[in-house]
UniProtKB/Swiss-Prot annotation:
Protein name, as recorded: GTPase Obg
Domain OBG-type G: 159-335
Single GO term (MF): magnesium ion binding
Domain OCT residue range list: 353-431
Complex and partners: Monomer.
Binding residue positions for GTP: 165-172, 190-194, 212-215, 282-285, 316-318
Entry-linked HAMAP family: GTPase_Obg
Keywords for this protein: Cytoplasm, GTP-binding, Hydrolase, Magnesium, Metal-binding, Nucleotide-binding
Cofactor: Mg(2+)
Taxonomic path: Bacteria, Bacillati, Bacillota, Bacilli, Lactobacillales
Protein location: Cytoplasm
Primary localization class, coarse: cytoplasm
Length: 431
């Protein structure tokens, strides 16, 4: 089964907790703090795999979780950092945040890696909090929580050349003749239900990847038929081979068919018609093909709706008429055509996990005497506070005061003994 869209839940590992410990060696009185730092949590990383052609592996496995870092230890020993969880995906996979729609990255290069959920840093042990006023601190941080999100992966096949056209115009037959691919071929519409890839190799040593895309029909850009589900795969192609059936068996006007497919391409993305396009007149071994081709060329010559008049190459996949000339022209176009930018990907600003601005805290007053605090920075500080040690709690209180939380609570109407809630933890407000 070909799967080209999937949602996956990913959870990076939390950092290990820092430790509160003291030196207790013989003959070392008042040895001081010796609690080590926690290890880094594992990240969830996508890695390109040239052997994969579909996202089928994610049909039943939808959750991936990286391991947490090890806790800090005595004698200033740092906990073990966790290994990253590597998820292999096919080339051409675009990754977005399923909740926000933010583009995270695009997997287009061999062995490329993309961090989609970053592991939390380890909490600091009490060796970091010693001072002249407090030489033996009972303060240590919990590990930073790892990122947790749902990502959407979308596969857009990586091919240099895309075959487009109505169903049963001969796309799969052409691919099977000029490459070693073996697509399903039958005498009915929509035989091809998934993209098929093949490598074309010319006698002069040039080669390129060709994709046979499922047949389009009117309204495809709006989801009719297989529709937009496979139009996305055209985005990465550099040259479009537009196949037109000249046999007349379907009793369609080849020129009208040509315009209908171009209309669907334009409706999906107007820039697609700016790409090099070759009209491939197929089934030229049929009796009426020559007459239909001449009529098509005459209409095309007077058509002023196109930005450029495409070259027309008559071929027959059965007799192999015209195939060498077609492939040579295609290779020539590829030699002079650069990669086209993928909209929303090439201008992507990759996430910077170290400089991302923290959200301001907010205060909610759902009922009299209850104030709920929330906010990314505030909640992260809370999660990294070791609630088992009073000095850690006092440090957290100072951090809140430094953020202006105390003043904001007073301004919101908080009074002595009112309940303050952060996540699942509650305490009393003391003015």
């Amino acid at each position: 089964m070909f799967v080209d869209q999937v949602k996956v839940d990913v959870k990076a590992g939390n950092g290990g907790n820092g430790m509160v410990a003291f030196r207790r060696e013989k003959f070392v009185p008042n040895g001081g703090p010796a609690g080590g730092d926690g290890g880094r949590g594992g990240s969830v990383v996508l890695q390109a795999d040239e052997g994969l052609r579909t996202l089928m592996d994610f049909r039943y496995t939808r959750k991936f979780k990286a391991a947490a870092g090890g806790n800090g230890m005595i004698k200033q020993m740092t906990g073990r950092s966790a290994k990253d969880t590597i998820i292999k995906v096919p080339l051409g996979t675009t990754v977005t945040d399923a909740e926000t729609g933010e583009l995270i990255g695009d997997i287009v290069n061999k062995d490329q890696r993309l961090v989609v959920a970053k592991g939390g840093r380890g909490g600091r042990g009490n060796i970091h909090f010693a001072s002249a006023k407090n030489p033996a601190p009972e303060i240590a941080e919990n590990g930073e929580p790892g990122d947790e999100l749902t990502i959407r992966m979308e596969l857009k096949v990586l091919a240099d050349v895309g075959l487009v056209g109505f169903p049963s115009v001969g796309k799969s037959t052409l691919l099977s003749v000029v490459t070693s691919a073996k697509p399903k071929i039958a005498a009915y519409h929509f035989t091809t239900l998934v993209p098929n890839l093949g490598m074309v190799r010319l006698d002069d040593g040039r080669d390129f990847v060709m994709a046979d895309l499922p047949g389009l029909i009117e309204g495809a850009a709006n989801g009719v038929g297989l529709g937009i589900q496979f139009l996305r795969h055209i985005e990465r192609t550099r040259v479009i081979l537009h196949l037109i059936d000249m046999s007349g068996v379907e009793e369609n006007d080849p020129f009208e068919d040509y315009h209908k497919i171009n209309h669907e391409l334009t409706s999906y993305d107007p820039d697609l018609l700016k790409r090099p396009q070759i009209v491939v007149a197929t089934k030229m071994d049929m009796p009426d093909a020559e007459a239909n081709l001449e009529d098509f060329k005459a209409k095309l010559a007077t058509d002023d709706t196109l930005p450029n008049t495409p070259a027309v190459y008559p071929v027959s996949s059965i007799t192999q008429q015209g195939l060498k000339a077609l492939l040579a022209k295609t290779a020539d176009l590829l030699d002079t055509t650069p990669q086209f930018p993928i909209k929303g990907v090439d201008d992507l600003k990759h996430r910077d996990y170290t400089t991302e601005a923290d959200a301001d805290f907010s205060i909610d007053n759902p009922e009299p005497g209850l104030f709920v605090l929330s906010g990314d920075k505030l909640e992260r500080l809370f999660k990294m506070t070791n609630l088992d040690h009073e000095e850690s709690l006092m440090r957290f209180a100072r951090q809140l005061r430094g953020m202006g939380v105390d003043d904001a609570l007073r301004a919101a109407g908080a009074k002595n003994d009112d309940t303050i809630q952060i996540l699942d933890y509650s305490f009393q407000f003391m003015d």
